Amino acid sequence: MEFAELIKTPRVDNVVLHRPFYTAVEGTLCLTGHHLILSSRQDNTEELWLLHSNIDAIDKRFVGSLGTIIIKCKDFRIIQLDIPGMEECLNIASSIEALSTLDSVTLMYPFFYRPMFEVIEDGWHSFLPEQEFEFYSSATSEWRLSYINKDFSICPSYPPTVIVPKSVDDEALRKVAAFRHGGRFPVLSYYHKKNGMVIMRSGQPLTGTNGRRCKEDEKLINATLRAGKRGYLIDTRSLNVAQQARAKGGGFEQEAHYPQWRRIHKSIERYHVLQESLIKLVEACNEQTHNMDRWLGKLEASNWLTHIKEILTTACLAAQCIDREGASVLIHGTEGTDSTLQVTSLAQIILEPRSRTIRGFEALIEREWLQAGHPFQQRCAQSAYCSSKQKWEAPVFLLFLDCVWQILRQFPCSFEFNEHFLIMLFEHAYASQFGTFLGNNESERCKLKLQQKTMSLWSWVNRPGELSKFTNPLFEANNLVIWPSVAPQSLQLWEGIFLRWSRSSKYLDEAYEEMVNIIEYNKELQAKVNVLRRQLAELETEDGL
């Protein structure tokens, strides 16, 4: 297919652009295979470049011969184009709808993007499982790398290389994979160097109504226990949902077969419940005419902060088991690709200072989201505005980022990255020039040859010029475990995501700049003080002689 076939009218003059916090701009609208571009006729610097893949929905309106297209973006922005001529307007709308809903992944922009910057580091090779294993192997010899999934035949949603107990061989892993949903046998997610406890993750066991068991599975997870110690099985589904799963061949670990493990059920919502929650929240945030009662009522009715609370509570529970109880943890829901990853990731941010650095957080996303098989292509296919909903779309990753922001807000000096870093990750998960978030798992990315044909997001982010934008000026390395509050009054709406297009951030930006300047000035003064102290010490030494 040629993009030209979908572009009926490639250029229209005298188009007026309306967008939040900008004055209206009149200019020339151009459509390319991947971008909608509007250039001002008065000011050459005034330009809008919008990826078609960032468009969630469009509305059309006509008054006489003047047409209006309202574009609703996946990053929650809403822009308006006033186009002279009904035919031109209909053609532009038709082209945008076609170009923003391309079926083939290989037609997406990352396959056509050619970076204008020098690649200092290839992000595709920055965070490999072998590197993570090396980090842990200095503290323990009880684990090994397994390449059993090197051709993705055991588990299509796992990477080729995983970390498993050394006492369990690959033949046993095959049997365990057959006993777990999607072949997702328990693998190491995190090793707590302080006491040797671990977090493992998997899919649900396929016990069914007959209570099927797998002795190799029991041996595998028992291999993580110390003598006389119990472990915790955290199921991210309610007991009722887990019991219903047995009728479909799924289920949960039977106490009789896992006597050393205590099972805890939490209730983290999935799929359409989360999607509906996002739709209600964005709708409430976009409505400018609410009185206080109506606004608070709509915010509460969205249940967004309730989902945040449930996820953070479960992550804190997992971290508590590891650090305070001295017990290992296995976490799963149904597939083990959504709520499971939210919990394992957030538990590591609580426990592990490395995950609160920029590179450590990037490694966490690679390891616990991309390599762990979170289906980004499906979950982020649409955002809050699209009417043609599919059952697999859900803001799982956005909820995770929101949870991280809640912790960052409570511990503003413990994170090397800032809020802009989290917002950037949200934007690129939904629409990007980079290939990092394409595909649903490593198997699909391998077939698409993303490493050879697209650029990694990390290659761009980790350049010194870009990193400075995402660095927290308040950061001071904190090697302690951090315990966020999950009390309702401690959780807030993330304005930087949900209100950034409905109210100006000008004064907040100015205050942030002023804070950065004060911190820099303070560092300069501290450096001068240190020099003067050294000089004073030298003079005192000379006088003593």
UniProtKB/Swiss-Prot annotation:
CDD domains: PH-GRAM_MTMR9, PTP-MTMR9. GO terms for biological process: endocytosis; negative regulation of autophagy; protein stabilization; regulation of phosphatidylinositol dephosphorylation. It is found in: Cytoplasm; Cell projection, Ruffle membrane; Cytoplasm, Perinuclear region; Endoplasmic reticulum. GO terms for molecular function: enzyme regulator activity; protein phosphatase binding. The modification N-acetylmethionine is found at residue 1. The keyword Acetylation applies. Homodimer. Heterodimer (via C-terminus) with lipid phosphatase MTMR6 (via C-terminus). Heterodimer (via coiled coil domain) with lipid phosphatase MTMR7 (via C-terminus). This is Myotubularin-related protein 9.
